[in-house]
Every structure is written in structure tokens, then in C-alpha cells.
Amino acid sequence: MLDERLVTVLTNEDIRLLRVEWLLAQREDYKIPRRQELEILERADQGLSPFLTGEEAAALIRNGAREVGTLSYGWLLPWDPDPTGERLRLLQRVLKQRPGIKAIFWDQATLYQPPRIDREQAAFDRALDVMMDLYASALGTTCVLLPKPQRCS
């Protein structure tokens, strides 16, 4: 299969895709935290998980319907790609117009961020080896290019 390396990393949850349904349910002033904080939220089991399971994510790539969105943008601060939350609000508007996108790759939330413990660093390294496949997948993904927020221009 064309995207087999990507499917393996998703199945193993080295990369965890964000569930669009969860993203759209977030209030307007919500800010996307690091993956580590989202996993704590997931373990608290307060309803809909922010993440797809590894099997759910792999199935979206395998079905060839381009249901995974991959964000492309520059980080506004070295430690925070979206300090004002403006990118999340823009992404929510885009996703409402593109109901076929079921999951999102957003590096801040889907890859482990510093500081990382050893197992997180190992997962991050494996994810980096195939991360560009998310942007280059001919079958599984759609790229979403977010502009620089007005307040930062």
C-alpha cells in the first residue's frame, strides 16, 4: 500500500489525529494544548475523545477518501503555534465548510511536544520519520494552509 509507513505510525499512535467532531465542539476561546495535556483530558473520559484511536486513524488513510486534513502553517511563537486561538477559530470555520474531513493532523496536538519523557521522545522520532507522508499522501490526506493571523501580521 502507498501509505503503509504512515498507517503503521498511526496504528501505533506515534501520531494521534484530532477528531474533527471534537474540534468543532470546542468553545470560541479554546486554545489547543500540547498532545500530553490532551491525553490527560482523554483519560479523564469527559465525553468525546479529542483523538481518534490508531485503528480509526489508519482506516481513514486506507479508505482513500482524503478524510484526513493536514495543517500547514508557521508557528507564531517557539512554544505556541496559536497563542491567540485565532487559527483554531479559522480552522473550525474551514471544517464546517468541509464536512468530509473527519480528522486533523495539527503538530502541536498530535505529536509529543517538549519537554518529552523517553517514550514520548521515541514516539516523536518515529513520527518525524514519516510526518511528511501526511502532506504528500496521494490518497489519504487533504492539506489545509492557514494564513498568518491578522493580529500577528
How would you describe each model-predicted region?
Residues 1-153:
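The feature represents the membrane-entry module of six-transmembrane cation channels
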